[in-house]
Amino acid sequence: MIRIGTRGSLLATTQAAIVRDALIANGHAAELVTISTLGDRSSAPIETLGVGVFTTALREAIEDGRVDAAVHSHKDLPTAQDPRFTIAAIPPRQDPRDAVVARDGLVLGELPVGSLVGTSSPRRAAQFRALGLGLEIRPLRGNLDTRLNRVSNGDLDAIVVARAGLARLGRLDDVTETLEPVQMLPAPAQGALAIECRAGDSRLATVLAELDDADTRAAVTAERALLAELEAGCSAPVGAIAEVVESIDEEGRVFEELSLRGCVAALDGSDVIRASGIGTSGRARELGLAVAAELFELGARELMWGEGNSPQGS
């Protein structure tokens, strides 16, 4: 029996159940074990709780043997690798884009100036301000239902959340607009899951690897390499999205490339620095480092640590 650790929220258990069911479909007995995390117990802003707020307790449960593996929202994992654990599988990714849920079915351009938009993500808030729509940003915590209710009860005019979470909970009908990357780059690894186990457990890692998706792993590797190089931690105003795309060479042959777009935004929205690059899936990390280097050349370091930004600021 493979014991799979998960946070207790509906979204987390739904995500972990997808992994459990996939393992069972492959002929492996599996069950979920709920683990309480600091991020679930606290209502404080995420950036004040430190890196690993949703993942530390799950990793402790792996280490002390309460569970054999854990399912994380990949974007919540610290960028620094922990030698005690290995990410044995990254399943196929859900849509990584951000989504707007607004009152009366409105899209962003229809919201009046001064409308209240909920998000506690510095990345979303910074890119929102950069759009220049005159919208007021308000803090947003709690599970997905709690967040959605703040729109339906009139407390907020709109909220911005990951489309992937809404999809996994069957709530896509609530989406009034899906934000394209040209409007808002998502958090690195948004929409992807990470299945982690003990580094020395090669037998389990082999079983879990049956669920790995090579294209998703390449994309997430590039995005997270960019984030790690920017030394931003998971709450800094950094966006990134990578995807495997088909190209055609001079002789008409189709081949695959890995495309990466990244940005760093001033928290007040006064500036957004963007860069992009093309590489291969086999050198995904190098692509992430190259795009990060371009962002640095364009002034990302000064923008991130300048006035109005701080080192602990998804």
From Swiss-Prot:
Any single GO BP term: protoporphyrinogen IX biosynthetic process
> What job does this protein perform?
Tetrapolymerization of the monopyrrole PBG into the hydroxymethylbilane pre-uroporphyrinogen in several discrete steps.
Q: How is the cofactor bound?
A: Binds 1 dipyrromethane group covalently.
Other remarks? The porphobilinogen subunits are added to the dipyrromethane group.
- Sites where S-(dipyrrolylmethanemethyl)cysteine occurs are at 234
The reply on keyword Nucleus is no
Organism this protein belongs to: Mycobacterium ulcerans (strain Agy99)
GO CC terms, sorted:
cytoplasm
Which Pfam families does this UniProt record tie to the protein? Porphobil_deam (PF01379), Porphobil_deamC (PF03900)
The membrane spanning regions, by residue number, are none
Q: What is this protein called?
A: Porphobilinogen deaminase
- Which reactions appear under catalytic activity for this entry? 4 porphobilinogen + H2O = hydroxymethylbilane + 4 NH4(+)
* EC number of this enzyme: 2.5.1.61
Q: Quaternary structure per UniProt?
A: Monomer.
Superkingdom: Bacteria
Q: In which pathway does it act?
A: Porphyrin-containing compound metabolism; protoporphyrin-IX biosynthesis; coproporphyrinogen-III from 5-aminolevulinate: step 2/4
Q: Which Gene3D superfamilies match?
A: Periplasmic binding protein-like II (3.40.190.10), Porphobilinogen deaminase, C-terminal domain (3.30.160.40)
Q: What class of enzyme is it?
A: transferase
Query: What protein family is recorded?
Result: Belongs to the HMBS family.
Listed InterPro entries: HemC, Porphobilin_deaminase_cofac_BS, Porphobilin_deaminase_N, Porphobilinogen_deaminase_C, Porphobilinogen_deaminase_C_sf
Keywords recorded for this protein, A-Z:
Porphyrin biosynthesis, Transferase
| Molecular functions (GO terms) | hydroxymethylbilane synthase activity
Which cofactors does the annotated protein need, by name?
Answer: dipyrromethane
Annotated SUPFAM superfamilies: Periplasmic binding protein-like II (SSF53850), Porphobilinogen deaminase (hydroxymethylbilane synthase), C-terminal domain (SSF54782)
